[in-house]
Structure formats: C-alpha cells, structure tokens
C-alpha cells in the first residue's frame, strides 16, 4: 500500500515518536503518544499499529541495552519474564478480535484506578531492592506469570505496558523502581517483537515512515533511560503518575466521543 505524508507531518511524527520514546523508557506508556500521532498523520489503523511497533521495538532495544550496561536488570528474572511476555503478546494478537471495545474499555477503567492508588498511597514504593537474589520455583512462576499477563495485555490493549510492569515488579518481586524499570524493558522488548513479527509477515510496516521515526524513538529512549537511571525513583514515580493520568484521560475521551 502506497502511503505518503507531507514533510511537515513527517516532522511532526519524528518529534512525537521521540517524545514517546523518552516517556516510554522512563515510565512506560509511550504508545499513548505515538499511536494517536500515527493515526493523526493519516496512517490506517493496521499500518499504524505495525509501524508503531517497529519504531517502538527499535527504541526499546537501545533502552534495554542501556539498563543492562548499568546493571539495572535482574537477568534471570528478565529472561523468564520475556519468555512469558512473548507468549502472552502472541496470544493477545490472536484474541483481540474476539473482545469488544466496550469490554476492553471497562477493563481499563477497572485497572487504572487500582494502579493509581498503588502509586499514590504506597508511599514506600521501594527505592531499595528487597529481593534476596535467589531464584526458586515460586519466583520462576511469578516472573513467567508477570511476563505472560502483561504481554497478553500488551497484545490486546497496549499503552501503559511498561508502567504496569514496573508496578508488578516492585510490588510482587520486591525490586526497586530502577531494577523494575529495567526488567520491564526486557519484558516489553519481547512483547514488541512478538507483535512486530506478525506485522512484518503481513507486510504492514511502512518503512519509509517507520525508519525515521525509529531513529527518533531510539534517541528518546536513550535520553529517557539516562534520566531514569540517574535520578531513580525521584524521576520514575512522577513520570508513572503522568502516564496513568494520560491513560485515564484517553479512556474518558474515548468513552465520551
């Protein structure tokens, strides 16, 4: 399909996908910015999702490498979560057509307030790692479960995946925000590639638009991950709240409009 956009719209997309990469690497939720941007630029929905996954996967790859080099990833847990996430995202891509928009919207209205309460009222969201470093059967199953559940969410819904991964890793695995964010990147990377593979096989990625946006997204991810690693909880927590507010606002606007 021959899709063309104006130079001004291309510049707009490059700017927005760069900002999306910054937000996503810091707290997750970059898709909330980039998906509407692609749609606004005139890409059909299927091409929007595919091209967004392409640029997001490229950016997340570099952010994940940044977190890994800084020692902010529990590799064993990250690999297990990635396996679960890949499977969950692949399954989500197949079942999404079975769910109505109303059901998905209702699910999100139930999930977001809970997430907001956890962040707002759990004052001791850890800035120190409470994990003892061991990996037993319980933690193995928990890591696989977190990966599968959030990967499934990413395949079915999408925006906010990284934010929910941070919440899951801090509250369930005992990670500090920095390590939770790093492992969330590994999880999100696997989920992105699971979806991207499907889109590539169907020829839905618009490369002449996606490649410049991918470069911008990479730069945004590198900058955002730098701030997240340097500032830690002081930077990540406010960004998480901003993303949750944006998510809730999008749901309300979708319901009203």
Where are these regions (language model features)?
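Residue-level signature of the transmembrane alpha-helical core
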Residues: 14, 18, 22, 53, ...
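Residues within membrane-spanning alpha-helices of integral membrane proteins
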Residues: 10, 53, 108-112, 116, ...
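Transmembrane helix exit motif
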Residues: 62-72, 109-135, 248-257
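Selected transmembrane alpha-helices and immediately adjacent juxtamembrane segments
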Residues: 1-44, 130-181
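Transmembrane helix-loop junction
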Residues: 40, 93, 97, 106, ...
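Selective hydrophobic functional segments
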Residues: 50-103, 107-110, 192-242
